A protein has these predicted regions:
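Conserved flavin/dinucleotide-binding core of flavoenzymes
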Residues: 2-8, 12, 23-24, 32, ...
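Short hydrophobic core segments
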Residues: 14-16, 39, 241, 259-272, ...
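Glycine-rich FAD pyrophosphate-binding loop
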Residues: 30-55
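Dinucleotide-binding Rossmann-like beta1-alpha1 core, especially the glycine-rich loop
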Residues: 58-130
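A short alpha-helix-loop-beta-strand transition element characteristic
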Residues: 75-96, 164-171, 310-318, 322, ...
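Active-site/ligand-binding neighborhood in enzyme catalytic cores
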Residues: 135-239, 247-248, 268, 278, ...
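Conserved beta-strand-loop-beta-strand element in the redox core of flavoprotein oxidoreductases
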Residues: 245-260
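Flavin (primarily FAD) binding-site architecture
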Residues: 267-285
Length: 457
């Protein structure tokens, strides 16, 4: 990777964004023999994946990190790049906090009162059945799309959830998957997301689900390896794209320090960021509406570092879900050899928005207090602490991914993927399988590259 000195360049294809989607697209294009340039606003590759050093050559993943079963695209890419995965630590009992009480349980569902537990099971089966009726390539064509897209998940819960326990568990599932509150999300979007993963259990589970495995050396290595394979001069860092002039003849992509002319462009950044680029001629109103309405989730990913994972000695897995918060979900995020010990906690939705206004030291105190509550006094005194407020990131504006509020799928969803002239769209938000996940990002890049190759012949 180099920061080129030229003020202008030409290529067959220009890719905007050097995250997983953009680099996967560029890799596929290079493999097919196309000349490609990738423009990245940040001073690094990886997008919403980022490795954070914690000493002794070890890292923690401060962005997206997990892969799981059925995520064939990203798991295949990991293998192709010579990387390995290791299982998330799940051995031991988990903690569930509600109403000031800490309960311990094994498996995926907390031990709560039988009536509430039975309702949770019934609701999960019902949501899976509803999701099965949503075509992932066109959610707006679901038989009940208009009805489901006219309400929030919160309003659906109000009508269909009877026990407080079930309501609390469903809310934790929602903020844990989308980093948004139930009131923020269209019911249709929730159902689409479940369908794109296969089931709500695949979305929420560790063992056997989306949180099953991690990448040895950190998930950013996937992007770093792809960028290395592309070779010098292909990826231009610190090059935020400001405008795209497009016609049937090609595109001219203008950044702060470089202008690239090409036959085709792949815009591989979240819709909310793609909407901040100036297009000439202007994009259709339905596409503008999509960019304006598809918000990013709100999350602060926090990690406390300890000399050893002492909770394992007490028979605890490190996994926690808390109704009380502000840390709502936590995991053991230690390196493969278990040293040092690392506890991961998420501040999500409303809690994240409140925490982003605080200093890192203040967030450290908040997270340490939560961990002390969950795991005892030793957890309240980490030797190090790292976090990332993704909503404050200029070139992310939130994580984990974009989500649709009521009305957006039925009004604007059809504009999400189709090319507009010589501009193609990629990114985790455009995926039909594992939307919003690293797997979805990789598959979207491959799909956009195939579109371009078909167009340029």
């Amino acid at each position: 990777m180099q920061r080129g000195d030229l003020s202008s360049k030409q290529a067959e294809v220009v890719v905007v964004g050097a995250g997983l989607a953009g680099l996967a697209a560029a890799r596929a294009l290079r493999t097919a023999g196309s000349d490609v340039i990738v423009l990245e606003a940040r001073d690094r590759v990886g997008g919403r994946t980022l490795n954070e050093p914690i000493g002794d050559g070890k890292v923690v993943e401060i962005g997206a990190q997990w892969v799981g079963p059925t995520q064939d695209r990203v798991n295949g890419l990991i293998a192709e790049l010579g990387l390995e995965t290791f299982p998330t630590h799940v051995s031991g009992t988990n903690i569930f906090e509600r109403g000031g009480h800490l309960g311990r349980y094994e498996g995926t569902i907390p031990k709560v009162n039988p009536v509430g537990l039975a309702e949770v099971g019934l609701l999960l089966r019902r949501l899976n059945a509803m999701a099965a009726r949503v075509p992932p390539e066109a959610p707006w064509q679901a038989p009940r799309a208009a009805e489901w897209d006219s309400q929030t998940f919160a309003s659906w819960m109000k009508r269909n959830v009877r026990t407080g326990v079930a309501r609390d568990i469903l809310r934790l599932a929602i903020i844990g998957v989308w980093a948004a509150e139930p009131r923020d999300l269209s019911l249709l979007h929730v159902l689409f997301y479940i369908r794109s993963a296969g089931s709500i259990e695949l979305l929420t589970d560790a063992e056997g689900g989306a949180q099953q495995d991690r990448v040895v050396g950190g998930s950013q290595l996937i992007s770093l390896r792809m960028a290395e394979q592309l070779g010098a001069g292909v990826v231009e860092l610190s090059t935020p794209v400001r405008s795209i002039r497009h016609s049937d003849a090609g595109v001219t992509v203008v950044s702060d320090r470089l202008t690239v002319s090409a036959k085709r462009a792949i815009v591989a950044i979240p819709p909310t960021l793609a909407g901040r680029v100036a297009y000439a001629p202007a994009l259709p109103a339905v596409r503008d509406g999509l960019s304006q309405r598809m918000a990013q989730g709100s999350v602060v990913k926090c990690m406390a570092v300890y000399e050893r994972p002492f909770w394992r000695e007490r028979g605890l897995s490190g996994a926690v879900t808390s109704v009380s918060g502000p840390v709502s979900v936590g995991f053991d995020n230690s390196p493969p050899d278990g040293s040092p010990g690392v506890l991961l906690g998420f501040l999500e939705g409303r809690a994240a928005r409140e925490a982003m206004d605080r200093s890192r030291d203040e967030r450290r105190e908040i997270v340490a207090e939560c961990f002390g509550r969950f795991f005892g006094p030793e957890a309240a005194k980490p030797i190090d602490y790292v976090d990332r407020a993704w909503g404050a990131e200029e070139w992310s504006r939130g994580c984990y991914g974009g989500f649709m509020p009521p009305g957006a799928w039925t009004d604007n969803g059809a504009a999400l993927r189709p090319p507009i002239g010589s501009i193609h769209w990629a990114g985790a938000e455009t995926a039909t399988v594992w939307n919003g996940y690293m797997d979805g990002a990789v598959s979207s890049g491959a799909r956009a590259a195939a579109e371009v190759l078909d167009a340029i012949g």
